[in-house]
Amino acid sequence: MIQSTQPLATTRAQLLERLAQTETFDLAIVGGGATGLGVAVDAAARGFKVVLLESLDFAKGTSSRATKLVHGGVRYLAQGNISLVREALHERTTLLHNAPHLAQPLAFVMPSYKLLDTPFYGIGLKMYDALAGKAGLGATEFLSSAKTVKYLPTVQQKGLKGGVKYWDGQFDDARLALALARTAAAKGALLINYCPAEKLIYENHQIAGLICRDAESGRNFTVRAKCVVNATGPWVDLFRQQDAEAQGKPVKPMVAPSQGVHVVVDREFLPTDHALLIPKTADGRVLFAVPWLGKVILGTTDTPRHDLAREPLPFPEELDFILGEAGKYLSRQPTLADVRSMWVGLRPLVKPQDDDGENTKKISREHTVMSSKTGLVTVTGGKWTTYRAMSEDVLAECFRIGRLPSRPAGVTVNLPLVGAPADGAVTHRMNQSQGLHSYGTDAAAVAALPGAQNWLVDGLCEAMVRFAARFEYARTVEDMLARRSRLLFLDARKAAEIAPRVAAILTEELGQDVHLNDFLALTRQYLPAQG
């Protein structure tokens, strides 16, 4: 049963006034992605006075561009990283439990074209089950070729010997980020997007806060805080460099960025509730075909990238690789003309000492938390699945260096996120189109707003736009169509078509420029060049 709740307003003028009026925060977090938002939830839940500042929109960077999987990491098991797999499996269970409206179990099928592939991969996945223990989502199955085709109707049948089925999870990354932001706010944290942290403040050679700027008005704010956390993902080295300059010494970069390209095609390419896993591509990596929100995601790549663009573009060879590899395992070869949207995420992989950063498959997927002599706490690496454990490690470091008084961990293990049904019931599947069901317990509040019956496109009504403006921090058309609705990531052409109508509603709600033309230009980057 879904109960009605009263959402917390996110009126920007009130948020900024609160920022101006607060004398000192316990914790100032820079970065509104999965990691920063997770720290905000944990710290606020422990009773600390928290502010989080994001230069653009929450989850604008890496955290909205994942492969949408909540997973223990099958490939990490193959690398022998048992501790990472065990932690991730535990966190997978916690996430699925705390946000069942946004994260759910998903069955994967791995087709086998060699006789020994089924037992080889199956035994490894049985180990995966064993590591999961009671946290397992379902037992690994060895499949006949007929059963494999039943689960994957469009799989390439020529030479098919059988398959293996196992369980992991999937989620809506951007909406989970919003749920974290709203959960932190409900616990008393102050979160502001479009408010970049510009400069660190020092007293007696120790960090005492920062200066931030409201990107909409240009107004500067001095934010004093007992502890400052740098959770800016692939961009953490920019703040570390500023901190190092204050100390008068150079800093060695700790991030080796890698980009992952994802391509979205129509459901007809994989008309099933099961995901397809390609265990070994031409370059030895894993490739997924994942049903998600009425479409299918194909991905991903793992390409070193030395620039840090906010909107990175795929290399042509990456698109060729994904479509080509998918075509080897699907009965119909997807082409560029079939691409409905595409996106690139930058992974903040932790760079080992003396590594040139070129082999991103072997660079650490684990997270790193460190602090400087001035007291700047930096966290990077990791993945969405383990965001909660990362948050606990960040606060442990804040305690260790004496910036905050220690308080017991574990407060977020059984903390339902905003929108989660009290009984933990799953009311819809993640592979169906978006709709009011995506809001969980907020569905009634959305339906009560004007325009609940005015559908702009399948899965998006006028009331959802109003709800985003009033209760979900949305400031622009992009915020709405990329991260409150996921339409830009599902069908960039449709997103462009309805953008003017969305802009009109947002303008009515916010009374300001909502950057329609910027969004229309952006939609073109989410489609491959034709010809």
Regions found by a protein language model. Name each.
Residues 29-30, 223-233:
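Short hydrophobic core segments
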Residues 1-27, 42-46:
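Extreme N-terminal leader/targeting segments of oxidoreductases
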Residues 23-25, 217-227:
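Core beta-strand elements of the Rossmann-like FAD/NAD(P) dinucleotide-binding domain
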Residues 59-86, 90:
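Glycine-rich active-site loop/strand segments that organize a redox cofactor
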Residues 193-208:
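A conserved short coil-to-beta-strand element within the FAD-binding core of flavoproteins
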Residues 15-18, 24, 28, 56, ...:
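C-terminal accessory subdomains/tails of enzymes that are appended
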Residues 44-65:
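Glycine-rich FAD pyrophosphate-binding loop
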Residues 32-33, 55:
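Glycine-rich Rossmann-fold phosphate-binding loop(s) that bind the pyrophosphate
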